[in-house]
Amino acid sequence: MVPSQSHPAKTPRKQLKPPIEAVQSHYDRSNEFFKLWLDPSMTYSCAYFERPDLTLEEAQRAKRDLALSKLGLEPGMTLLDIGCGWGSTMLHAIEKYDVNVIGLTLSANQLAHNKLKFAEIDHTRTDRTKDVRLQGWEQFDEPVDRIISLGAFEHFADGAGDAGFERYDSFFKMCYDVLPDDGRMLLHTIIVPDAKETKELGLTTPMSLLRFIKFILTEIFPGGRLPKISQVDHYSSNAGFTVERYHRIGSHYVPTLNAWAAALEAHKDEAIALQGRQIYDTYMHYLTGCSDLFRDRYTDVCQFTLVK
């Protein structure tokens, strides 16, 4: 919630409202629909193709390995996953690092999916706590040891113009406050180039690009905002974080999106039966168009390793 000009004081974090309707309009389309074109782990963010011959499932596991390896996880720690999706990162962390997990999601379908997955875990092999909540970061205030957020930050800003990004201030302060003195956080988000990089890349803004951006913000991710690296730097440092590493992996989103589009096309009849022809066409346009954006470097992905 952005304060009005007549009331410049910042809104207290717990009075900020999570974008529940906007998030559910996309992620609650139906689990069955997403299963048609995501990999078996249901990971819905840029994969990491360490080698070009990896399958999408292998590349998604490599991405989770990459992200989790930057956190310094130890057995018994508690990992907070903000925007946990369908839970693949939490399950990976439990399996590989023997940690407790808390997942936050605004999707009712993802909540139900994660509860089922947690119930399937062999409790004779681990007694770690596994908690998933229908809750935004705005209401979270419990101590944790590490934080990860993959492909959710794009939903955290609000409104148009620079004022909409001020929610980042509250987000990073919450993260800083719940972490211990040696706390670490991995933030994986789509980014856009600043003016200098845009010029260096020779990027232009044709009408076709503007139409596609409007399509994405209207039909796919209403309310979505993409940050620049400088904005992550600014708001995270305001909270007290230092960026230990910037790791740009946007080139890997091209094969990720291409794999998703190919899988959706291969399941065209099933997708139409589930959601109708219009939704099928909309998602094909979204996936193929976004692949072009990453190919041409209008968008990128950066993993920020943040330390206290």
Swiss-Prot record:
Return the EC number.
2.1.1.79
Alphabetical keyword list: Cytoplasm, Lipid biosynthesis, Lipid metabolism, Methyltransferase, S-adenosyl-L-methionine, Transferase
Q: What is its main location?
A: cytoplasm
Q: Which residues form the active site?
A: 290
Identify the metabolic or biological route this protein is part of: Lipid metabolism; mycolic acid biosynthesis
Short name of one Pfam family for this protein?
CMAS
One GO CC term of this entry? cytoplasm
**Record's function text:** Catalyzes the formation of trans cyclopropanated ketomycolate or methoxymycolate through the conversion of a double bond to a cyclopropane ring at the proximal position of an oxygenated mycolic acid via the transfer of a methylene group from S-adenosyl-L-methionine. In the absence of MmaA2, CmaA2 has a non-specific cis-cyclopropanating activity and is able to catalyze the conversion of a double bond to a cis cyclopropane ring at the distal position of an alpha mycolic acid.
Instruction: Note the subunit structure.
Output: Homodimer.
Protein name as annotated: Cyclopropane mycolic acid synthase 2
Which species expresses this protein natively?
Mycobacterium leprae (strain TN)
Q: What is the organism lineage in this UniProt record? A: Bacteria, Bacillati, Actinomycetota, Actinomycetes, Mycobacteriales
